[in-house]
Amino acid sequence: MISQKAKYAIKALMYLAEKPQGEPVRTIDIAKNARIPKKFLEHILLDLKNATLVSSKQGVLGGYYLMKDPENINLADIYRLFDGAVALLPCASYKYFEPCADCEDVEKCRIRHELIEVKKQTLVALKKVTIKNLIGRRSS
């Protein structure tokens, strides 16, 4: 299940994507229009900035803006940033691999092999959904 933090990140990115490219948007405006608690949003925007998905400009006319084209930001990127591995078990993850305590041989485990396929298909589906797709759906 996607976390509330990841969902808010998606909403914030969608809001920024609807603004002119490179035009800073104040945190309070993002919070109000995307209906995200401001304090929570500040942490999310910092994570997005550290991941180079957004950048910020200081000052009276400052705020946050997208660093990537909305077409190049997908749900897999956001999910991994905020929620970690997509795999349902640690043994099915490449990045966070950890054998199950009750498994004798991970290479022969049929459950693991099926869950690796589920993870692959989930990643394909998440990568297909971009911020651009989402703002297109919302406005139609």
Regions picked out by a protein language model, each given a short descriptive name:
Residues 50-53, 81:
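Residue cluster at the C-terminal edge of the helix-turn-helix DNA-binding motif
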